[in-house]
From Swiss-Prot:
Family as reported in the entry's similarity comment: Belongs to the GatB/GatE family. GatB subfamily.
Subunit note: Heterotrimer of A, B and C subunits.
Catalytic activity: L-glutamyl-tRNA(Gln) + L-glutamine + ATP + H2O = L-glutaminyl-tRNA(Gln) + L-glutamate + ADP + phosphate + H(+); L-aspartyl-tRNA(Asn) + L-glutamine + ATP + H2O = L-asparaginyl-tRNA(Asn) + L-glutamate + ADP + phosphate + 2 H(+)
Gene Ontology BP term (one): glutaminyl-tRNAGln biosynthesis via transamidation
PANTHER family xref list: GLUTAMYL-TRNA GLN AMIDOTRANSFERASE SUBUNIT B MITOCHONDRIAL AND PROKARYOTIC PET112-RELATED, GLUTAMYL-TRNA(GLN) AMIDOTRANSFERASE SUBUNIT B, MITOCHONDRIAL
UniProt keyword Protein biosynthesis present: yes
Broad enzyme group: ligase
Protein's name in the database: Aspartyl/glutamyl-tRNA(Asn/Gln) amidotransferase subunit B
Record's keyword annotation contains Ligase: yes
A Gene Ontology molecular function term of the record: ATP binding
Organism: Kineococcus radiotolerans (strain ATCC BAA-149 / DSM 14245 / SRS30216)
Length: 505
């Protein structure tokens, strides 16, 4: 049934939205959850498969120990209780992307449960709605294997309905997943989209700090399902929910919530009933479309996985993992904000670039926070992007960057010379000191040489000299550039400017 959408502000004035978020996280293990196939993203289709992930007769699963460790660390970071005993179950359904006709998951015995994550929700852009902290209650975090990836060819929607044929890539089948499920998020009111976005962003920061996933939403290593229902008042029973699947960006999470609130309100206003269903999010249009009626747990006929023994984590090991957890990102952000004076946006940019650890290590090596941030988010970030690698993979470390920053601060290198020295280090020519010496990059400190270059340029540009004497001091910029050229860039521009203005009079 098609109905005209209700304006979002009208919808939240009339109804109380209740959210539930399910986030699927691909773990960055080297091999799959129950087999030894690699997990590299972007490999040729169906080249990272094996008898277990293809469900061939006689293939037996073996649990990936690293995946279990990552699952426990995630649970601990989300303030969850860790199960003293848990087990896997078979989730039975038929679909081409799961060749076994069941998914190995956890049903009634998850590895982690009853946690929470405090989320800082920022003020609205127009400043009319203040910032606040919302505690998201975590119902469970459970382990499961990912499915294969379907490609539906032909048709107008990219979905299986109307497609001429479908292709399946089983490289993803069996990759370790953690599904993190919230309890209903109540009391969010008109800020429901902001809370949803802030939660996924905060969760992504936690996962990144644990180094358990690359959390690249655009590659599907972090996928969000948005459950939403409306009710007349906060005291009313929960309404019928819809589930919007595989929302793959923070902005889309926010937009999907807004759209579904407006759609649910329109359905309820019309006197119809909301259908419990899964829906597809369309990034290009900002709309959701119906997928299928939502199955209940009993429809999957869960039963214990007979080929895997129960998991009984050693409690001493769990406590060791707890003690080794990194500082929570929100706490770290507040600490560094106080120590460094960075804005939340600047901090977020460093986190998203994977640079925060490198910046902190560079500061510890002696650089100022501003200089460390400038290098890692500027020149080095551009180089990493150009090479298609992570910042941490570059052949330069925090100590090198701190040394470059110190040389610039001391006036021994200009910014341009420091960039040239960096190129040498990245090219494997040696340490910063070795590259500076080999390339002769040190700034000329001899005023005699600088004065000679300045006088040569002044003599060649009498018209510019007259402009400066006539009050146009900005004309000195052209002369400074020529002097720098004479000095092959090995001079301090500020000192050259002083000498030019002294001699012009």
């Amino acid at each position: 049934m098609s109905v005209e959408l209700v304006d979002y502000d009208e919808a939240v004035a009339e109804f109380d939205p209740v959210l539930g978020l399910e986030v699927h996280v691909e773990l960055n293990t080297a091999t799959k959850m129950f087999s030894g196939s690699p997990t590299e993203f972007g490999a040729e289709p169906n080249t990272q498969v094996d008898p277990t992930s293809l469900g061939l007769p006689g293939a037996m699963p073996v649990l990936n120990a690293k995946a279990l460790e990552s699952a426990i660390r995630i649970g601990l970071a989300l303030n969850c209780s860790i199960a003293e005993r848990c087990r896997f179950a078979r989730k039975n359904y038929f679909y081409p992307d799961m060749p076994k006709n069941f998914q190995t998951s956890q049903y009634d015995e998850p590895i982690a449960f009853d946690g929470y994550l405090d989320v800082d929700v920022p003020a609205s852009e127009d400043g009319t709605k203040p910032a606040f902290t919302y505690r998201v209650l975590i119902e469970r975090a459970h382990m499961e294997e990912d499915t294969g990836k379907s490609l539906h060819v032909g048709g107008s929607t990219g979905r299986i309905h109307g497609a001429e044929f479908s292709l399946v890539d089983y490289n993803r089948a069996g990759i370790p997943l953690i599904e993190i499920v919230t309890r209903p998020l109540e009391g969010t009111g008109d800020r429901a989209p902001d809370v949803a976005r802030a939660y996924v962003a905060a969760l992504r920061d936690v996962l990144r700090s644990l180094d358990v996933s690359d959390v690249k939403m655009e590659q599907g290593s972090l996928r969000c399902d948005v459950n939403l229902s409306l009710r007349p008042t906060p005291q009313s029973p929960l309404g019928t929910r819809s589930e919007t699947k595989n929302v793959n960006s923070l902005r889309s999470v926010e937009r999907a919530v807004r759209y579904e609130v407006s759609r649910h309100a329109a359905v309820l206003r019309s006197g119809a009933k909301v259908v419990q269903e899964t829906r597809h999010w369309h990034e290009d249009t900002g709309l959701t479309t119906s997928g299928r009626e939502k199955s209940d747990a009993e429809d999957y006929r869960y039963f214990p996985e007979p080929d895997l023994v129960p998991i009984v984590p050693d409690r001493a090991w769990v406590e060791e993992l707890r003690a080794a957890l990194p500082e929570p990102p929100a706490q770290r952000r507040k600490r560094l904000h106080a120590e460094w004076g960075f804005s939340d946006l600047e901090f977020r940019d460093l986190v998203n670039a994977g640079a925060i650890d490198l910046v902190e290590a560079t500061v510890a090596a002696g650089a100022s926070p501003a200089a460390a941030r400038k290098w890692w988010s500027g020149e080095l970030a551009r180089r990493a992007n150009a090479d298609g690698v992570e910042l941490s993979a570059l052949a330069v470390g925090p100590a090198d960057v701190a040394e470059l920053a110190a040389l610039v601060e001391a006036g021994k290198l200009t910014d341009r010379l420091a960039r040239e020295a960096l190129e040498g280090v990245l090219a494997g020519e040696g340490s910063v000191a070795e590259v500076v010496e080999a390339r002769g990059l040190v700034v000329v400190q001899d005023d005699g040489a600088l004065v000679a270059a300045v006088e040569k340029v002044l003599a060649a540009n009498p018209d510019v000299v007259e402009k400066i004497r006539g009050g146009k001091a900005q004309a000195a910029g052209a002369l400074i550039g020529q002097v720098m050229k004479e000095m092959r860039g090995k001079a301090d521009a500020a000192r050259i400017r002083e000498l030019v203005l002294e001699r012009v009079g």
